[in-house]
């Protein structure tokens, strides 16, 4: 026991409170418009850690269709981050936004890591947003929110996917995953609203609602035309052939189509998502997606 100069026991110093991690609060914005007979990125606000490439022209048969890669310059999402991405497709714009690789979600804390995506799609516009999977590391606590506002006549493909990975190979689970989707009219009327939550232990446990699958993906198709290629059995067959378990359903209020895919791992999920995406992309845009180097 430590003694003070007057031979009395010293009082222990009060413990310093443990503060929760403070994450980044960042908002990026992309606006695509029709100009000069093609699609141009008319406005961009891309602060760190967001990074984008220039718009590529990868469709010789549809030179007005732009492709843009969205990248992370920081190595993923970290504890208590709150990143927001706004994308607007103005009338007549046709754009495909993708990523260069999957995004790692690192160990979190009590406050979730948040990723919000807000899309505004005008009439006669086409937007395809299909990022690579979010990769949940052990202890990751992630909340994902996607909000889509679509005018009548808008066409869109929006995908979202998650997979688990333990760098030590010990099958340690993530902490928690929250997913939210809202599709609304320009007047604010909600057409679709979904919310889901699952703990990592339940995700990988013996009674998991995922069964033995460890990767999950969704696809929303808005403004889908009457096209035989979009029939549920054909889409399921394309994805199932890649090793996924696939469900296709009509969204409420005539909003479009909804697809859900389960897979044993992220690689299989990506293959199944890509197989379905190619079919839907061609049906909505009139051309197949360009080959994207990653």
Curated annotation (Swiss-Prot):
It is found in: Cytoplasm. Its main location: cytoplasm. Belongs to the UreD family. It comes from Methylorubrum populi (strain ATCC BAA-705 / NCIMB 13946 / BJ001). The keyword Cytoplasm applies. It holds the Pfam family UreD. Required for maturation of urease via the functional incorporation of the urease nickel metallocenter. UreD, UreF and UreG form a complex that acts as a GTP-hydrolysis-dependent molecular chaperone, activating the urease apoprotein by helping to assemble the nickel containing metallocenter of UreC. The UreE protein probably delivers the nickel. InterPro entries: UreD. It comes from the Bacteria. Keywords: Chaperone, Cytoplasm, Nickel insertion. One of its GO terms (cellular component) is cytoplasm. GO terms for molecular function: nickel cation binding. This is Urease accessory protein UreD 1. The lineage of its organism: Bacteria, Pseudomonadati, Pseudomonadota, Alphaproteobacteria, Hyphomicrobiales. Residues 1-20 are annotated as: Disordered.
């Amino acid at each position: 026991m430590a003694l003070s100069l007057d031979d009395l026991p010293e009082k222990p110093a009060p413990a310093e409170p443990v503060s929760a991690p403070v994450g980044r609060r960042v908002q990026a914005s992309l606006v695509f418009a029709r100009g000069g007979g093609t699609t141009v990125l008319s406005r961009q606000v891309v602060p760190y850690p967001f990074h984008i490439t220039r718009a590529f022209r990868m469709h010789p048969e549809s030179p007005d269709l732009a492709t843009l890669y969205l990248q992370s310059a920081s190595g993923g999402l970290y504890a208590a981050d709150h990143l927001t991405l706004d994308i607007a497709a103005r009338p007549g714009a046709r754009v495909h936004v993708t990523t260069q690789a999957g995004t790692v979600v690192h160990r979190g804390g009590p406050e979730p890591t948040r990723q919000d995506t807000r899309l505004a799609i005008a009439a006669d516009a086409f937007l395809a947003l299909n990022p690579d999977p979010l990769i949940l590391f052990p202890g990751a606590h992630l909340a994902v929110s996607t909000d889509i506002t679509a005018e009548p006549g808008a066409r869109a493909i929006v995908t979202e996917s998650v997979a688990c990975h333990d760098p030590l190979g010990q099958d340690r689970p993530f902490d928690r995953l929250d997913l939210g989707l809202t599709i609304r009219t320009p007047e604010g009327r909600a057409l679709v609203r979904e919310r889901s939550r699952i703990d990592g232990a339940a995700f990988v446990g013996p009674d998991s609602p995922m069964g033995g699958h460890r990767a999950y993906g969704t696809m929303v198709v808005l403004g889908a035309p009457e096209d035989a290629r979009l029939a549920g059995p054909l889409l399921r067959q394309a994805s199932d052939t890649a090793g996924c378990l696939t469900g296709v359903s009509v969204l409420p209020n005539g909003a479009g189509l909804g697809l859900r895919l389960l897979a044993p791992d992220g690689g299989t999920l990506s293959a199944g998502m890509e197989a379905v995406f190619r079919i839907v992309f061609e049906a909505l845009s009139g051309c197949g997606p360009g080959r994207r180097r990653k």
